[in-house]
């Protein structure tokens, strides 16, 4: 098992308050359309988010990895997790914006955002940062029946 998958399995065995979203969620659990360089783990509770440093430490001990905190803000934390010759970026976010689709799918231990929610998030991301990866994800979502125009108004 590669570091990314092993990290996800261990992370979500420690918490049910977070969910995976973004490009990695789309690639690993829905469409397998591109490689994503980071894991976006979101929480919707400040109390649960406050526990993330301990969760990361426990997970890294469990899987034999090391971690470095690269950014540490009240609602955003970025970690580099490394083992042997693999390194992944783990972004943890306290999501203060209400979820339009609060239910999540579960694959094994991993809670994963719904494609519908990710369409809305990708539309908002396009307006804010205009990165190619967001266009690729939106194209893939559209090609798989999640039409962006349908979600534009609620974005």
Regions found by a protein language model. Give the residues of each.
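Compositionally biased terminal segments of proteins
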Residues: 1-155
């Amino acid at each position: 098992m590669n570091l990314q998958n092993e990290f996800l399995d261990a992370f979500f065995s420690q918490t049910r308050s977070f969910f995976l979203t973004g490009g990695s969620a789309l690639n690993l659990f829905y469409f397998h359309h591109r490689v994503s360089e980071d894991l976006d783990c979101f929480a919707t509770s400040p109390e649960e988010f406050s526990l993330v440093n301990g969760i990361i430490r426990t997970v890294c001990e469990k899987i034999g990895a090391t971690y470095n905190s690269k950014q540490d803000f009240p609602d955003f934390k970025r970690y580099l997790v490394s083992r042997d010759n693999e390194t992944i970026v783990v972004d943890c976010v306290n999501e203060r914006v209400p979820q339009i689709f609060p239910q999540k799918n579960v694959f094994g231990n991993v809670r994963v955002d719904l494609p519908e929610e990710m369409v809305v998030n990708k539309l908002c991301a396009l307006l804010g940062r205009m990165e190619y990866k967001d266009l690729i994800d939106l194209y893939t979502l559209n090609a798989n029946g999640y039409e962006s125009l349908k979600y534009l108004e609620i974005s």
